[in-house]
């Protein structure tokens, strides 16, 4: 925890110095950005499947299932000249309910995450519509509930590195070093060091149609303890196309991919989802 304390103190001093420098700037803005409040849902309902188990028509003998996931992604964005400070809350939770015709229904989680983060960036240089400079970040990563007898994830994560940001398309593109303090398992608290690259991109194809992507790749370099479920590599990526339906309501297809490998496993685990999402996306200028 000593490393974490030193890092956070440095981040606060960094942010305070920048804020003091920009205090006299006239172009300060504070925005509440609702990046996405969304619902992803699909339902398959099959009636009288028992009578059609010998049918060559798969649709008549399939298992009924429900898939639903909710996403809440907001940020309080402060900009003052070269200084940018974002405080964000990301939450998602989803379940899949499977109902075979001759068995009891089963429910499994397909998503569960709560991420509270604060990010400070400073533009030392500006070129071609890009801002470039140092960035620091602190985050707390946890879950709504436990599943299948496993403990609830609890991780404090800090990043420091360089970033391109505040561009019309490249909202954030960063390369950082990472320090994690993982206290998911009681009695097995672990400190980890990693390298991470991440992005948040938005492209306006035409009025009312926007393509967006966000994600990260994290490579772990060292650990204070051996915990077989700790990840060695972790990739998460989302690609979404939003089309305005009415006002700030959008609908569109999305692709989500997660691939990772744990220390105690020889093969990669992955999760690939394609679907349609309904979203509410807007922003409110506070200053």
Regions found by a protein language model. Name each.
Residues 230-287:
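Predominantly the C-terminal beta-signal and adjacent terminal strand-loop region
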Residues 42-69, 99-106:
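Surface-exposed strand-loop-strand hairpins of Gram-negative outer-membrane beta-barrel proteins
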Residues 176-244:
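Outer-membrane beta-barrel transmembrane domain signature
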Residues 36-47, 80, 91-97, 138-146, ...:
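Transmembrane beta-strands of outer-membrane beta-barrel pores
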Residues 10-18:
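Hydrophobic h-region of N-terminal signal peptides that target proteins for export
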Residues 97-198:
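Outer-membrane pore/translocation modules
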Residues 68-74, 114-118, 154-160, 193-199, ...:
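Hydrophobic, lipid-facing positions within transmembrane beta-strands of outer-membrane proteins
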Residues 21-33, 77-86, 123-133, 165-173, ...:
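Short loop/turn motifs that connect adjacent beta-strands in outer-membrane beta-barrel proteins
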């Amino acid at each position: 925890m000593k490393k974490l304390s030193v890092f956070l103190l440095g981040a606060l001093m960094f942010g305070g110095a920048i804020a003091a420098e920009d205090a006299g700037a006239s172009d300060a803005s504070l925005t509440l950005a609702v990046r996405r409040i969304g619902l992803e849902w699909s339902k398959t309902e099959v009636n009288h499947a028992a009578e059609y188990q010998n049918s060559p028509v798969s649709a008549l003998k399939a298992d009924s299932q429900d898939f639903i996931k909710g996403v809440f992604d907001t940020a309080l964005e402060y900009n003052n000249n070269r200084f940018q400070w974002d405080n964000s809350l990301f939450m998602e939770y989803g379940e899949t309910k499977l109902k075979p015709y001759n068995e009891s229904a089963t429910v499994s989680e397909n998503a569960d995450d709560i991420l509270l983060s604060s990010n400070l960036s400073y533009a030392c240089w500006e070129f071609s519509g890009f801002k470039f400079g140092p960035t620091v970040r602190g985050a707390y990563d946890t879950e709504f509930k436990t599943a299948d007898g496993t403990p609830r994830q609890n991780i404090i994560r800090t990043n420091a590195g360089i970033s391109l940001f505040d561009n019309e398309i490249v909202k954030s593109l960063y390369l950082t070093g990472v320090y994690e303090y993982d206290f998911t398992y009681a009695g097995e608290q672990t400190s980890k060091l990693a390298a991470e690259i991440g992005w948040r991109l938005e492209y306006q194809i035409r009025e009312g149609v926007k393509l967006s992507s966000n994600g990260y790749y994290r490579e772990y370099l060292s650990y204070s303890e051996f915990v077989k479920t700790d990840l060695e590599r972790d990739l998460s990526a989302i690609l979404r196309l939003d089309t305005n339906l009415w006002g700030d309501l959008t609908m569109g297809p999305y692709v989500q991919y997660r691939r990772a490998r744990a220390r105690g496993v020889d093969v990669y685990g992955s999760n690939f989802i394609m679907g349609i999402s309904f979203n509410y996306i807007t922003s409110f200028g506070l200053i």
